[in-house]
Regions:
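Membrane-embedded alpha-helical bundles of multi-pass enzymes
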Residues: 7-207
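N-terminal acidic, proline/glycine-rich, low-complexity intrinsically disordered segments
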Residues: 1-5
Length: 207
């Protein structure tokens, strides 16, 4: 028995494949979280425009080929990174009376972020399911991703009391020429255009 056969007897190849797939998935979850956190740097006062395509293309590529549950987790991780850092300022209100409410600051931000992250997770699931079941051209895939993302942002801004903070379009606030389309399509329409253009590099990389 050669060494390879002996190794296969001790460690089954299917087990190794399972471990490799799990590691690959965890890498996508981590990438989703990091990409979401990077979006915070696209908003004022940082306004690093280059990070817009980096963040959204990373999510776009990371969702391809994932099952329903895994796509949800990757999208949720993106939202957790985005809101966990993007709305951390909410904690300041608990420190006004720190002795009474200070201990609630981190749990409150974490809980709200986890809840808001469901919206990008829904967009991620819808996109991943359609992309997995049908052969989408790059342009159509980008349009679908941007559409689902915009719908998720609209829902987040209107469901219950609404929370329309840190929309994708806010990344253009400091760029007068780029934010002009908002006059015709509004902030959500501008979010659609922003995300659509942002995922084009990701689609090109997968071509």
């Amino acid at each position: 028995m050669d060494q390879r056969a002996a190794f296969d007897q001790v460690v089954k190849p299917e087990i190794l494949n399972r471990i490799a797939l799990r590691h690959r998935f965890l890498s996508r979850v981590t990438l989703g979280f990091v990409a979401g956190a990077l979006t915070v740097l696209t908003f004022p006062p940082f306004s690093i425009l280059l990070l817009v395509p980096v963040a959204y293309s990373a999510l776009f590529v990371g969702l391809r080929g994932l099952s329903f549950g895994r796509a949800f987790l990757v999208g949720w991780a993106f939202g957790l990174g985005q809101f966990g850092f993007g709305i951390s300022w909410i904690a300041e209100s608990f420190y006004v009376e720190a002795e009474r409410f200070g201990a609630m600051a981190i749990p409150a931000v974490a809980g709200l972020s986890a809840g808001l992250a469901i919206f990008p997770a829904i967009a991620a699931v819808l996109f991943a399911e359609i992309a997995r079941r049908g052969a989408l051209g790059n342009l159509l895939a980008c349009l679908l991703f941007a559409t689902f993302w915009t719908v998720a942002e609209w829902l987040r801004g209107h469901v219950l009391t609404g929370f329309p903070w840190i929309l994708a379009s806010y990344a253009l606030v400091d760029y007068a020429a780029l934010r002009q389309p908002a006059a015709w399509v509004g902030s959500y329409g501008l979010s659609f255009l922003t995300v659509f253009v942002a995922v084009l590099p990701g689609a090109a990389a997968m071509a």
